[in-house]
Every structure is written in C-alpha cells, then in structure tokens.
From Swiss-Prot:
Keyword Membrane: yes
Function comment: Involved in the export and assembly of C6 fimbrial subunits across the outer membrane.
Transport recorded as keyword: yes
Stated family: Belongs to the fimbrial export usher family.
The protein's name in its UniProt record: Outer membrane usher protein CssD
Pfam assignment, any one: PapC_N
Keywords: Cell outer membrane, Fimbrium biogenesis, Membrane, Signal, Transmembrane, Transmembrane beta strand, Transport
Protein species of origin: Escherichia coli
C-alpha cells in the first residue's frame, strides 16, 4: 500500500538496520510499496507475550486505503473510519459508494450509509496493509467503464490566458512578428473562449480577432452547445468556420463500448444450443439459446478487433462453426446509437465572400444489421443540398460506404457520388483502402456559394488507393496512389508513392519512391529518398544521428546529416543540429547549417533556432505560456489545453507531475497538466523519484473526470519533515511490545507507525513539535518530539522514554 512517498538518505548502524528491516516487513503501509497481506508465526514471539497486531485497536480518523471491489482494486482514497463494537469500520457516504460503481438499493442519505441494508454483502478492513475489501453482488455493479453525471468535474472558476510570441529575422533586416493572446473564462460548466492575433511584416501590421464563442456541455443529454464563431463538426459534409449556434452530439461523452462500432453475431439454432464465440483462444461469449434465430452484440469490453469464430453445439452434440470477419469506417456507429449535429448561422469571410446565412443538420444512426445510416441537409439563399448514405460491414470484403449528395444552386442541379472501402486482412497482416468520388459539373458545396458558385475549375472525379502490409520482423510496406481530374483539365494530377520501412540492428531505415504528374507541367516528377535514424544512447535522455538523401529526375539532389537529442529525464531540453547540401543540375551547390533548441519549463516553453548559408541567414525565437487566475491565487504555467488540470502541492516546488516535459510545481506549489481527455478517467501521477528530500506525500496518484474545457483542481497533501527512528523505553525500563501502534495526529491526517521487537519505532514526515501516542493491550504511553530531534536531513535515531 503506497501510503507515504519520500526521498531520503539513510545512514544508520548495522544493528539498527536489522530492526528497521523487520519493522518495514511487518508495517508495509508506512514505508513500503507492497500490496500483499502479511502474517507471522506467534511462536517466534518472546515467551509470555500474548498479543497480536489485531489486538491493538487503531484510533479513529482518516486513512489512505486501497479499495477493492470483489477482490479487484478500484482506487486509493482517504476514507474516515470510526470504532463500532470492537472493530474499525469505514464511513461511506451514498455519493462515495456510487463513485465506486455500486448501485445501492436504498435511500439512506446519512453521512455513513448502513451498508448491510444497502445490499452490500460484506466489508472488511485489513489494517496491516490498509486495504478495504468490499463484496458486492454483480447485479449492483455498474458497467465497468460507465461514467455518471455525478462523476463529472466541471472544474474551478478561472480567468486564464494563453499567449505565444514568435519573431523571425531574415538576413538581419527583414523582421516578421506574431503574437497570439487567448483570454478565457470558466464559470461552472460555461466556457468563454477568445483568440486575438497580431502580425507584423516589416512595417505592415495587422491585429484581428480570430474567434469568440461560448460553450456548454450537457452530459446527461450527451450534447454540446456552442454560440459564436466556431467550426462545423460533421461526418456528412466538409467542415468550415461559421458564426452562429450549434447543437451537436459530443461523442467524447460516450464510452468506447457505447459508441464505437462492433459487429453483431447472428445465426439460427436448430434446437436448444450452446453458443461459443472466440477471438483467437479467448472466449468472449458463452451462452445458451433456445431453438430459432439468435443475436449477440459484441461489446468493446470483450472485443479487440479481428476475426471471430462462432461455434453452435445442439442438444445432440452436433457442432456447426463459421467465421465472422469485420471492418469499420469512421462514420459507423454502435447499433441503436444516434449522433446528430445542427447548425444555424453565417459562413465566415474565410469561407464565403458574402457571409450568407445558412442552416445545416446531419444524423448518423447505427442499425442492428452491422450498418450505419446517415443523412443531412444544407439550406441557404438560392442553395439547397440533400445528402444520404450507408456504411456497412460486409465481413471479409471489408466495410463499404456509399454516399450520395444532390445540390441545387440558382436552380441548377448537380450531384456527387462517393464510394469508400476499408478492408483489414488480419490473417495476412494487410490492409486495403480506396475512395472514389464523381461529381456532376453543376454540383456546388456550401462554402462555394459565397464565391458565386465557384463553377470554374470544378473537380470531376477523384480516386485514391492505399495498400499496407506488415512483413513482421522484415518491416512494413505501403503503396499509395491518387488521381484527380477536373472538368476543364487544368489541374489534373496523378501521384504514386511506394514506401518501405525496416529496422537493421539499431538503425531505422525508410525508403520512398514517388512519381507525380501535373497537367500544368509537361515533365513527370520522379523522386527517390532514403532516411536513416540511429540511436546512439539507450536511455531516455537520448542522442540520435540521422542521415537523409533524396534525388529527383530534375537534377536536384539533397543530402542532410545531423544529431538530435534531449537532456534530463523528462526530455524538457531538446536540441537539433543539421548540415544540408543541395546540388542542382546547373552545377550550383548550396550548403546550409541549422541549429535549434527548445526548453520546457513550469512557466512556459521557449524555442530558438538559427539557419544560414553563404547567401542568407535566419533566426527564430518563440515563447509560449499561460496565466491562471483562480480562488487560491495566480499560477504561471505552460499553455493550457482545451481541458487541463491545475495541480497543487502546498508551497512545495520542483515536484515532477505527469509525463509532459517541463511540468513541475512552481514556486507556489502549482503546476498545470495541459492536456486531459474530457469525460474520461484521467490519472494524475506524481513522479515519486523526483520528490525532494524531507517531503512526504500521502498519495502520488489521483483520478479525475473533467468536463470539456474544464480546469480541474487536484490537491495532493504533503508534509515537510524528516524521518526518525525512535528507540523507546517505558518508565519501568522495558520496551513497548512488538506490534504496539504509534500515531501522531496532525489535523485530520494521522501519521502512524508500529513498534518492532526491539522497541524501535520508525516515523516519517515529522516536523516542528508534537506528541506521539503508543497503544497496546489497552495501555497507552506518550512522548514528545521537537525540532532538535528532527534537525538532521538523514535518518535520525533518537532515544525516548514513553
């Protein structure tokens, strides 16, 4: 049980180590990382002793415990405990029980629910390892990955700013500046977002507002509301910016098992039969069915993709077997699920000359026949578009999509037909994808109408094909082909590329051959390239070398050699050095040098680079970061993402949080984790190897489920103090017996230890002054400690009379 996490340097004598090791063995929750149950043989106790660890009743208070539901660890949490009868029992509220995924069947709203009346089978607390075991009937358990609205954290009220400043200087005279400022407000579940941008090109300056919008999520309805300037989000139509209002399904609010397409198993049983569905050697369905048709949905909790083998055994022992292959496309949804998107507003000037008013809607619906139906409409001045289609899983031949759209602009009709296919040939470790589209000349998209129909240079048809094949230890092979044809033939193009990636010893090698043909150029563009990357060190702060070469039939050859790497365990300092050489068919040769570095600090990310040759030079500098104003003060951080976590460890700096480079607690104990998944369980983890000396944390891991756009506050309790090994004697000259429990109460938190067989007591995180109470067999003794006892940074051994 991970109750305390610290970084200490121990220096004690040999006979003290023996006592300490024994103490750590019988008291894992104080210093160790074990989760196992411990016991010992009472025959090894001194004669005349008649006690055990269980004979001393621990004090009431709050304990950090590991919670197990039906012997499976659910989480670690601080739980209040009180004495009932001769046991220490947990105080579980209705909200806490619900957060554990248990649906209790009574309306007990008291502070501590009577668990036996709520349908919970049994609760037991193992104090020696601080583990709380809860036995619950399966019918009271929620879905494994189900999240209720009560679990969602809307975060704190905050005013926060993101900023970025870029400067580029070319040949020491041409200067380009860019500044972006994003002032944002979070209030309950409402989000106000803004972006302002400044550009300067020498003496030419522009300042503009990029967007402003207000957003709110409704988790129970699984929808998202946006008012202002935003982007469409459609699986039916192309996406573009608009000003207006949108109401749409937020697919992030669904768990994968609720929204992602998985196949359904259909069949017919001739008699009462046993149905077994296997994926490889794993049984994911084992059910009895009566005679007649049957159907089983496959959930994501059971299924990881690939071929399924179905076995039907009737009452006479006869067996029938068949195979179910499946593939999917992004448009496909879980059977019975509907996803929708409705918008009204005006196209922004970026997409339309006139900013015409429009309305748009689209719906996707997953059917029970391994298919998804979808359709939509767009309506604007002199314009109408109606779209419909189907995506279906046809088994071995893959997933297919047929999409038909019809437009009418100023009484001129056009249509677009799109056919897509995706096949994953898993037995062959291969995949095939193609996409074909044909447009009638008068077909117009919504974004074209502001430009008077944009009937010039219209696309006639397009075709793309992608093949990929895994060669296992021999690498990966892929082929891509694209063809586009226009009605006036002005921009017709063909392109093909063949790529082969493989690993040789420690080197990673990629080769690529490409062929491109454009209508506006008479000559075909043929290119060959090779890239070699070789790691020179194995640790995380790695250094790699790289070499690349490319040659074109135009006579241009380019080669590059360089080194890149990172420093520190979290790679917060990165660097890159390159030397490039370009030779053209006219004999001209250009040599260019490039050097760049970036540093991620708790307060922002800073980047600089320089490139130059004998004819030009270029310098680039960038700084980005964030400022968060909240009820507990101000935090200077890296840029906040769409959904973030503000971690607080009281006034303790330089503690590493998560895996993002440079995210450490700042001078006031705050750190920002910039990117969380909305409506999903996110684990906030402290790197225990980076905890400074003299700091003890009650926990290094917490879990949050933020709403979209939230800044959730995550507080870790920490204590500044040192570790002490007390040598205890009682007033009569004896020592407290093995298993005597010591505790020091600091606020609500209890610092606990256990006495070993030589009277040695190990306590961690002690600071200032205090009183430690020791209890055994109904007896109690106390002793004080002071600053003098804990002045050493190393483990101190202090004699005390109790």
């Amino acid at each position: 049980m991970n109750q305390f996490y610290k970084k200490s340097h121990y220096s004690i004598q040999k006979h003290q180590i023996t006592g300490l090791l024994f103490l750590l063995f019988i008291y894992p929750f104080s210093t160790s990382y074990g989760n196992e149950q411990f016991s010992f043989d009472s025959r090894f106790l001194p004669s005349g002793y008649n006690y055990s660890l269980n004979s001393n009743l621990p004090p009431e208070g709050e304990y950090l415990v590991d919670i197990y539901i039906n012997k499976i660890k659910k989480e670690s949490a601080i739980i209040p405990f009180y004495i009932k009868g001769n046991k220490l029992v947990p105080c579980l509220s209705k909200e806490k029980i619900s957060s554990l995924g248990i649906n209790i069947n009574n309306n007990d709203n008291t502070e501590c629910v009577e668990t036996s009346k709520a349908g919970i089978s049994n609760i037991s607390f193992e104090f020696s390892s601080l583990r709380l075991f809860i036995a619950v009937p399966k019918n009271l358990l929620s879905e494994i990955d189900k999240i209720s609205s009560k679990d969602i954290d809307n975060g704190i009220h905050a005013l926060f700013f993101n900023y970025q400043v870029n400067t580029r200087l070319a040949n020491n005279k041409n200067r380009y500046d860019y500044i972006s400022v994003s002032p944002n407000i979070n209030y309950f579940s409402w989000r106000l977002r803004n972006l302002f941008e400044f550009n300067q090109n020498n003496d030419e300056k522009t300042w503009e507002r990029n967007y402003t919008y207000l957003e709110k999520s409704f988790y129970d309805k699984k929808l998202n509301l946006v008012v202002g300037e935003s982007y469409t989000n459609s699986n039916v139509y192309n996406n573009y910016s608009f000003t207006g209002i949108s109401v749409s399904t937020d697919t992030d609010m669904y768990t994968p098992s609720e929204i992602d397409y998985t196949p359904e198993i259909h069949g017919v049983a001739d008699s009462d039969s046993q149905i077994i569905v296997r994926q490889g050697n794993t049984i994911i369905i084992n059910e009895s069915v009566p005679a007649g048709p049957f159907s089983f949905p496959i959930t994501n909790l059971m299924y990881t993709g690939g071929q399924l083998n179905v076995e039907i055994t009737d009452i006479y022992g006869n067996k029938k077997q068949y195979t179910v292959n499946n593939s999917s496309l992004p448009v496909m949804r879980k059977a019975g699920l509907m996803v929708y998107n409705f918008i009204s507003g005006k196209l922004t000037k970026k997409n339309s000359e006139d900013g015409d008013f429009f309305t748009q809607g689209d719906i996707n619906y997953g059917t029970h026949y391994n298919s998804t139906l979808f359709g939509g409409y767009q309506f604007s001045k002199n314009y109408f578009n109606l779209s419909t289609g189907i995506g279906t899983d046809l088994g071995f031949s893959g997933a297919w999509l047929l999409h038909v759209s019809r437009s009418n602009f100023k009484n001129k009709n056009g249509y677009n037909i799109n056919l897509q296919q995706n096949t994953q040939l898993r037995p062959f470790n291969a995949g095939v994808n193609f996409d074909y589209a044909y447009r009638k000349k008068r077909y117009v998209e919504l974004s074209d109408i502001g430009w008077h129909g944009n009937l010039y240079n219209q696309l006639k048809n397009s075709f793309s094909l992608s093949l990929s094949k895994s060669l296992n230890k021999y690498g990966n092979f892929s082929l891509d082909y694209n063809k586009m044809k226009y009605w006036d033939n002005a921009y017709d193009s063909n392109s093909m590329s063949i790529r082969y990636f493989f690993k040789f010893m420690r080197a990673m090698i990629t080769t690529n051959c490409s062929l491109n043909k454009y209508q506006s150029y008479e000559k075909k563009d043929k290119r060959f390239s090779i890239n070699i990357s070789l790691p020179l060190t194995k640790d995380y702060g790695h250094i790699s070398s790289n070499y690349s070469f490319s040659n074109a039939n135009t006579g241009t050859a380019t080669s590059s050699v360089g080194l890149n790497g990172s420093f520190f365990n979290d790679a917060r300092l990165n660097w890159n050095i390159q030397q490039n050489r370009t030779t053209r068919n006219n004999g001209y040769t250009d040599n260019t040098s490039y050097i760049a570095t970036s540093y991620a600090s708790p307060y922002g990310v800073f980047t600089g680079s320089y490139s130059g040759s004998n004819k030009y030079s270029s310098q680039f500098y960038s700084a980005s970061g964030g400022i968060v104003l909240h009820s507990d003060g101000v935090a200077f951080t890296q840029k906040a993402g769409d959904t973030s976590a503000l971690v607080r460890i009281d006034n303790i700096s330089d503690i590493k949080i998560g895996n993002t480079p440079g995210v450490y607690t700042g001078y006031n104990g705050f750190a920002l984790i910039p990117h969380l998944q909305p409506f999903k369980k996110n684990t906030i983890l402290i790197n225990d190897k980076g905890i400074p000396d003299g700091i003890t944390l009650a926990n290094i891991k917490k879990q949050v489920i933020p709403s979209r756009g939230a800044i959730v506050k995550v507080k870790f309790d920490a204590k500044k103090g040192n570790d002490i090994l007390f040598k205890l004697t009682t007033k009569d000259g004896k020592t407290p017996p093995l298993g005597a429990i010591a505790h020091e109460k600091n606020g609500k938190q209890i610092n606990t230890g256990i006495v070993d067989d030589d009277g040695m007591l190990y306590m961690s995180g002690l600071s200032g002054t205090g009183i430690i109470n020791v209890t055994w067999n109904g007896k109690v003794c106390s002793f004080p400690f002071s600053e003098k006892d804990i002045s050493s940074k190393q483990l101190s051994v202090v004699n005390k009379q109790c």
